[in-house]
């Protein structure tokens, strides 16, 4: 039976009729959850509750109930990740975790304070990854690797800014500006590929596809990456008339790709590069910039964040 794709969009309500070729869409208006106008990242706990890195704090969607937990320093939460019974978050010059108390409310503990971690000036944490029983907090300047059991902390300091970090095929990768793609091996950064394209374009997504490493650049090109070679991987998004700039991407549980653009909406593509849907303002999306995409396995839905 064909799986129905549900897309939940934030901030705008649209009352028009959908074409039969467009998947059903449910939208949440800003007034429904009454918090910041931008969500930067999403995660889901084992009970199915959704958590969003919101401009005003940690935003929770449990069933139909929205709830906001303000960040302790009142800064924007940039990253969020559910691991076990904790919801980890990263923000401006701080990162830590949230745990539910006896009343069902989430309380925050700063790992920066608890572990006496020296934070760099104006450092923000844009991604959180769970890898080999370690938790990785990524800022533009470095990777902070935490072993939560013994609270041991290690640091990786590239010489140039970190553009993105990924967990793919049981490996941890990061892209360093002007240097290329690196992986982490035994706590050390090792160069994977320093081809010219990886020094100039930003990888917004890195995936396993049919046993190979597949990267999506912000300049609307897919690349197969192997050892120190890189090959352009053809897809139908290159045939679109618009020049696309990608900002977000996710591989879904059925091997399709959900791709978010700046100013050109949302694209759904299969594992062979075939375009399935391109939804933008003309399809009813009120804002064409997609900050993040997430595949929710428990509720068979895709969440898209709009700017």
Residue ranges and their predicted role:
Residues 1-307:
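Carboxylate-rich, polar loop motifs that coordinate divalent cations or form catalytic acidic clusters
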């Amino acid at each position: 039976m064909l799986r129905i794709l549900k897309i939940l969009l934030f901030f705008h309500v649209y009352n028009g009729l959908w074409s039969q070729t467009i998947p059903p869409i449910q939208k949440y208006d800003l007034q429904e959850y009454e918090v910041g106008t931008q969500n930067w990242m999403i995660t889901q706990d084992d009970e199915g509750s959704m958590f969003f890195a919101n401009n005003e704090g940690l935003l929770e969607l449990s069933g139909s109930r929205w709830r906001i937990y303000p960040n302790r320093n009142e800064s924007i939460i940039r990253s969020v990740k559910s691991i076990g019974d904790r919801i980890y978050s990263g923000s401006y010059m701080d990162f830590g975790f949230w745990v539910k108390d006896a009343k069902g409310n989430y309380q925050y503990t700063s790992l920066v304070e608890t572990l006496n971690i020296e934070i760099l000036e104006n450092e923000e944490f844009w991604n959180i990854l769970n890898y080999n029983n370690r938790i990785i907090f990524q800022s533009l300047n470095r990777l902070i690797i935490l072993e939560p059991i013994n609270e041991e902390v290690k640091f990786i300091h590239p010489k140039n800014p970190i553009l993105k970090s990924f967990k793919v095929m049981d490996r941890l990768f990061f892209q360093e500006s002007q240097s290329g793609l690196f992986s982490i091996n035994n706590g050390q950064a090792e160069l994977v590929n320093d081809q010219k394209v990886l020094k100039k374009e930003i990888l917004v997504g890195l995936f396993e596809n049919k046993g190979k490493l597949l990267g999506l650049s912000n300049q609307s090109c897919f690349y197969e990456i192997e050892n120190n070679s890189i090959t352009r991987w053809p897809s139908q998004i290159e045939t679109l008339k618009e020049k696309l700039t990608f900002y977000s991407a996710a591989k879904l549980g059925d091997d399709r790709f959900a791709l978010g653009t700046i100013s050109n909406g949302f694209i759904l593509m299969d594992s062979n590069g075939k375009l399935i849907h391109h939804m933008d303002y003309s399809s009813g999306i009120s804002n064409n910039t997609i900050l993040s995409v997430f595949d929710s396995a428990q509720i068979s839905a895709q969440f898209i964040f709009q700017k």
